[in-house]
């Protein structure tokens, strides 16, 4: 091997090392209708405004929540990547302010029919997201189905969205209980962070967190972190009706500022090496169970 070729190989290896793992954050809820997907799109926008490249992966089976929130109909979805030969970049739909999203479509539901080699190829394709994004937001389904749990136990960071309504709090605890009982769950590798949505006052969100945190710590060995609260805001309702996130439609609103504050908290949190697993390892954990 000549000196020039050796130098080229060294540069190639250095460039490969420079590819950083994307930060993977799952957003979930114990029940539907509490603002989970709304949280996903607004957090994505706030990360993007801080200079991050953000892609939302819509893993809410059969429900096109993200495309509805953005008012955008995607040309391709995950099924086109899996079954129709499309490349990963082709199925990423451009959204507002540079945020991209991948629609699950019917593709996720068909995963059960894939053999191991097909799943390996799928994971290989999805792992390219490490090069295309700094932050991946996984918008999971609501509730405690096995498909939701597979995403949560693999996720180094999970944001649990709840409201002060008793049914929402009860369902949030049920989700945490199901998570704690999953054989693949590890409290060291899966950090759960709470957002209290639709609160009347900030104190209401803090009280909700303290109560849920106390019982989850005592009975489930899950230590919740508190990210903050989103208040009742008519601007959110108006933004939803026009199929735009409130952070885009009303950037000066109270709720938009709260989403910004939450992302600032997330940005200031140090990510340990065993929590910065990247996209490849995340999807391997989801789809390639031992």
What is each of the regions a protein language model found here?
Residues 1-31:
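Extreme N-terminal, non-catalytic leader segments
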Residues 245-290:
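NTP-binding/hydrolysis catalytic cores, primarily Walker-type P-loop NTPases
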Residues 59-131, 241:
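P-loop/Walker-type NTP enzyme "switch/lid" segment
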Residues 140-228:
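Conserved catalytic-core segment of NTP-binding enzymes
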